[in-house]
């Protein structure tokens, strides 16, 4: 904050002006001793800003570790809570699949940590079971936020900075170093955080240790997390729910009597037939349970989830005596588990399902007959894989996901604060990173209510069933990076030049394994009674002449479903794609005096891939990306900004592998997706704060979708070849983005210093969607990835010394636009039909959040937040989007949408300690 003070001439000033020269003359005459004062150095750690990489800062958001703490960011959904225009993509099983920005999501938004690309969203093409459609996880590994020094979010094409994937934007994380924990002037530092989040009963415990002895230094961060599912508003799950369950009742037929041989201890058929049992048939019985225990499409609550995360980061290093040279290493391991049960799958059989299965399977031997008094033993039908399943057991569908990331590397850093050599900054690094997503699907039918994930079929549980399916997807990178920065002047023009180089050897591997089922049978046979006084007996099931059957202990049968080489989902042949890539980028941000800043960047990327499978669409891609920006400064309080940039996304590993339908397919040529971004803004700035408004235009082309090549034959459109991933679509969007922060003390110095207000707004509009004429069986691009227009208004106070602060935030979201969910599908016969992404869209909603902090003796900071203060019931589009056709694991068969309700009033607390 700057203030202007007017100098007023008065009697006191005149007296001092008159006296001081005389006093100075007397001192000089007395030849007083001169005294050299000690030089005072003030050091401050450089904070990352929006304009570090690109001169305009348009579309950029930067969050430091302090910002993450203040906003109480504990997971990926908290990171962008108050940032309109960027949203989390829900994976459908508790995990996430990256971010959505400007109408694109998942692999079209780059996600990197220290320049290392994180795993791609890889979705297998066929259903595992239950109500989810993806064979593999489809998730993107999440970042441990306690390891993060800063995160830069870029909205709009950004491949010149982040390479492939930055088609619509990028999210780049930077890892902490020892300096971020060691306080100024100290040789060691300890930081601890304990946090609790009420929305998911999440508990976080993190501790960071750092020390420096001579030139040696090290940092160790250990973080553990445990949480459940995000709980819906209490009103959404209030009450009880009822359902039908198949129960055994006596068969009314007069030909439904039987006796069991093993139960006739004292005689044969003639003696035992006096006490026959009756066959059972199924009849629906109404049952009522709590909303938490209910299973079925009308479930009110979200699926139960158990989430755990364990992470550690170790960064040792040595800084040489002149402090210009640093050599260090990095070791990181993070493992996250997401264990959930799909409770939209009914646990119990109903008469309708039972009869339908019976009709399809035909007559089943022994149906209706049971041993002892266990009537449920007589109710069974044909289930999945034609295995018999009994009505007495409940069905459970479970997804266990384990995400494991390991990284180790070396780095050399050269820093020249004097800026008197060829480089002000240079960094050379080598990293080896491996990320694996282990997705295990289990379907059980062997416990009373289906809740036991660990039950298995056994001989004493006839008609019990178990199915397993496991898909493990992994990616590895061996990345060598070099970065150089230099500032210099030419003809009174300031240049900030940077050069970046990189070389990567990478691999992608998908393993399909543990794909089998187990089924418990029972021994059953229809017996012929022995002759009675030489007369043959022929039972007919009547009460006086019941059937004579044998029911004994059965066995468990295990069948492998895995096949090899059949080119369908059951194909368990490992998939591997390997390759290499390199890039070279140069950027120069130029200051043209006080009136203008100009920046431009250029990047060249090369990627080559190969596979042992000749039907994989591998190949070589060469791409050129660029950006340019200008800031005009006609006044101290005004900036006029404009930038343009390009982006691209290379075909993903899943797209290269292709769509397999059983036939031998041929590799196809897939070009990179391309984007072009234009953005113009105006910035008002001063002691009052700043306010930025911008307009953007994003054009996408060569979007990759699954479909067929089309050809005209005999005047009619016909398909050509097999289904494949092809470049087929283009689209264009425009929008408005507003950001602002007001310092009220700067507006009027009578107001308290530290009082501020913030404002953010984002709106996106779809302008154009096109399909290539030589493509068919193509779904038009549905913009379900666009976040509804959103306003975020805040006001808060930070005590000038940082001892305490409080903040209130109002978030208002408009309804989801129906036009963004409507599209059409080009059919094989040349016609088209209208389509809709999902059956529901969200209504407008608003919430109020309040948070604050208090620091005790500079070492302890207590933070607390009340979210959805007014306990408003609402549903976010990000949650409902899990039912959309483009969802990673689409939620199907959804009867009610209560389960997508956001949390009601909830609380977050954290205690931070720094020494």
From Swiss-Prot:
Its main location: membrane. One of its GO terms (molecular function) is ferric iron transmembrane transporter activity. A motif (TonB box) lies at residues 38-45. One of its GO terms (cellular component) is cell outer membrane. Belongs to the TonB-dependent receptor family. Neisseria acquires iron by extracting it from serum transferrin (TF) in its human host. Acts as a TF receptor and is required for TF utilization. Binds both apo- and holo-TF, via the TF C-terminus. This is Transferrin-binding protein A. It comes from Neisseria gonorrhoeae. The gene is tbpA.
